[in-house]
């Protein structure tokens, strides 16, 4: 029988309290509320101390090290311990805002069986999600969205029964077929990660210990698969029925051996039942949210000369500020001495010392810089049909005009063309005008319109550019009449559906875009595509290179 919403909460917390290090933790998707407090209040049942952390926590707090301010004040080395030095339950607030660096550090800490992470995901939007590296490592997931308060109750975990379960956990026997069954079920559910069946096996052992079983049973496996696989499973796809096996001739005796004894009876772990049970518990829309990711906040508002961010390593200097010395921070020595100088006579009298310099933590000044990333404008040009050469000429001219100002605006440009049955990267991101003219010379055109292929390649180029620290923008130039689907077929309806799906992926990735309709009359299909991209739509028939360059400059905020 499937678990109810609150029964699922209690079951997850019970297993986590038995083996927190083996299950790694819990992804709790819920806004701050009394309901969430009811769940976090039950974390006291876990056999580890609770430590609260936040997305901006520094390496000094996580790993410890030399406390420079205290060392300067005391005159002797002062070492502070880090949160990760001792096993703990790490409660991460606002987990959806976790940056990749912190996610990597927490993931490394979870790989050692010492800590347990409770990720409090407060994301209000579909694209605000926990980093996938942490999603993969945490065994359990709970979503409290839409759960009424009246259907909940106080969580009372029996401490004596939990202690007994922990004591017998190591002695629980695991049948060899249990791990194989979980691995096959994960594969049938479309789960690629190898961590998932390992975590499910740990959950099954914890469930067996809770129930007092000497070995893992099929019911333990079913409960573990429900709790660990449901939010990871891919939707069921329609598969073609298998071809019937040829029947042997009637006059030929059947010499095949009888099936093994285990197959003649009932399977110990019925895989089909496990798969159906997991699919029944599949959270609604979670897979689409995971596909969209949490990157839409990153590049949505990039304008001007690229994304600007405050840093402490390089860029245009900003006034220093008070702060603590942590990993990556650079002390402003002059600013620190200037802040400490007026207090020296008073400090010498208070400490009755003739030391030359007495520095307090409040004197520390940290250098700040404003870093500006380079922009890259990715032209995705429709090079198909009779008007291909005109569009390519416009794009070539616009690229050369933009490159002429690239050094002043820190711009790069890239050009890809889609025609025939595929898309091709003509020009990787560059600022070289000579290289650009050489690559653009003699670019062919004509054929079908694989619009979805162009969007897919633009997405790949944009993500690669962003990984290199650049701020990409996609400029799509087309007349909107896509007629080649992703599978290569000349199916206009499927091609339009594929293009809209790729547009949603591009929007979810956070890459800003602009759609330029080069048809003689505005195309409603392109306006719909622009809405799917959340991008400006500009109808620009008979555009020349100067007009196109001006439009793109305005769209990018110049």
Swiss-Prot record:
Q: What's the superkingdom here?
A: Bacteria
EC numbers on record: 6.6.1.1
Please list the residue ranges annotated as the VWFA domain. 376-555
Which Gene Ontology molecular-function terms are recorded? ATP binding; magnesium chelatase activity
Q: Write down the Gene3D superfamilies for this protein, in alphabetical order.
A: Magnesium chelatase subunit I, C-Terminal domain, von Willebrand factor, type A domain
- Annotated membrane-spanning segments are none
Listed pathway(s): Porphyrin-containing compound metabolism; bacteriochlorophyll biosynthesis
Which terms under GO biological process does the entry name?
Answer: bacteriochlorophyll biosynthetic process; photosynthesis
Disordered: region residues: 234-268, 298-325
* Signal sequence range: none
Q: Where is the composition biased (Low complexity)?
A: 298-308
Q: Which reaction does it catalyse?
A: protoporphyrin IX + Mg(2+) + ATP + H2O = Mg-protoporphyrin IX + ADP + phosphate + 3 H(+)
Alphabetically ordered keywords of this record:
ATP-binding, Bacteriochlorophyll biosynthesis, Chlorophyll biosynthesis, Ligase, Nucleotide-binding, Photosynthesis
Family statement: Belongs to the Mg-chelatase subunits D/I family.
Stated name of the protein: Magnesium-chelatase 60 kDa subunit
Supply the source organism for this entry.
Answer: Cereibacter sphaeroides (strain ATCC 17023 / DSM 158 / JCM 6121 / CCUG 31486 / LMG 2827 / NBRC 12203 / NCIMB 8253 / ATH 2.4.1.) (Rhodobacter sphaeroides)
UniProt gene name: bchD
């Amino acid at each position: 029988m499937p678990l109810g919403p609150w029964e699922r909460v209690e079951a997850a917390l019970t297993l986590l309290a038995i083996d927190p290090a083996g299950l790694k933790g819990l992804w709790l998707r819920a806004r701050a509320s009394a309901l969430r407090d009811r769940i976090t209040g039950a974390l006291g049942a876990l056999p580890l101390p609770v430590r609260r952390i936040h997305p901006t926590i520094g390496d000094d707090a996580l790993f410890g090290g030399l406390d420079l301010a205290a060392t300067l004040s005391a005159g002797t080395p002062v070492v502070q311990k880090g949160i990760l030095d001792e096993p703990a339950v790490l409660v991460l607030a606002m987990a959806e805002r976790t940056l990749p660096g912190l996610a990597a550090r927490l993931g490394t800490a979870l790989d050692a069986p010492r800590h347990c992470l409770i990720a409090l995901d407060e994301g209000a939007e579909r694209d605000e999600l926990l980093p996938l590296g942490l999603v993969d490592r945490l065994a359990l997931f709970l979503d409290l969205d839409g759960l009424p308060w009246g259907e909940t109750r106080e969580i009372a975990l029996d401490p004596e029964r939990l202690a007994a379960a922990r004591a017998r956990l190591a002695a629980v026997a695991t049948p060899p077929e249990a791990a194989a069954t979980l691995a096959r079920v994960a594969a049938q559910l479309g789960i690629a990660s190898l961590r998932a069946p390992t975590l499910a096996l740990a959950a099954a052992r914890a469930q067996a210990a809770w129930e007092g079983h000497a070995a893992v049973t099929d019911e333990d496996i079913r409960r573990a698969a429900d709790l660990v696989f449901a939010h990871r499973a891919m939707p069921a796809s329609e598969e073609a029925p298998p071809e019937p096996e040829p029947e042997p001739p009637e006059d030929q005796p059947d010499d095949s051996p009888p099936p093994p004894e285990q197959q003649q009876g009932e399977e110990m772990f019925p895989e089909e039942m496990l798969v159906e049970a997991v699919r029944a518990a599949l959270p609604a829309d979670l897979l689409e949210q995971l596909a969209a990711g949490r990157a839409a906040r990153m590049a949505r508002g990039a304008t001007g000369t690229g994304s600007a961010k405050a840093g402490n390593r390089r860029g245009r200097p900003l006034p220093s500020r008070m702060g603590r010395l942590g990993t990556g921070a650079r002390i402003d020595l002059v600013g620190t001495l200037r802040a400490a100088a007026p207090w020296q006579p008073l400090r010498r009298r208070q400490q009755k010392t003739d030391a030359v310099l007495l520095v307090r933590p409040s004197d520390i000044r940290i250098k700040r810089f404003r870093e500006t990333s380079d922009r890259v404008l990715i032209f995705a040009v429709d090079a198909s049909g009779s008007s291909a050469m005109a569009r390519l000429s416009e794009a070539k001219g616009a690229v050369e005009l933009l490159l002429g100002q690239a050094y002043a605006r820190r711009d790069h440009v890239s050009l890809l063309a889609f025609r025939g049955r595929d898309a091709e990267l003509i020009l990787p991101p560059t600022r070289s005008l000579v290289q650009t003219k050489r690559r653009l010379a003699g670019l062919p055109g004509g054929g079908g319109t694989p619009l979805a292929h162009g969007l897919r390649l633009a997405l790949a180029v944009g993500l690669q550019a962003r990984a290199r620290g650049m701020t990409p923008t996609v400029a799509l130039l087309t007349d909107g009449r896509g007629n080649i689907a992703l599978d290569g077929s000349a199916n206009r309806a499927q091609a339009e559906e594929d293009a809209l799906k790729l547009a949603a992926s591009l929007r979810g990735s956070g890459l800003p875009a602009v759609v330029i309709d080069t048809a003689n009359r505005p195309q409603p299909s392109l306006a719909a595509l622009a809405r799917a991209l959340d991008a400006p739509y500009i109808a620009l028939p008979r555009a020349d290179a100067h007009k196109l360059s001006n439009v793109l400059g305005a769209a990018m905020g110049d």
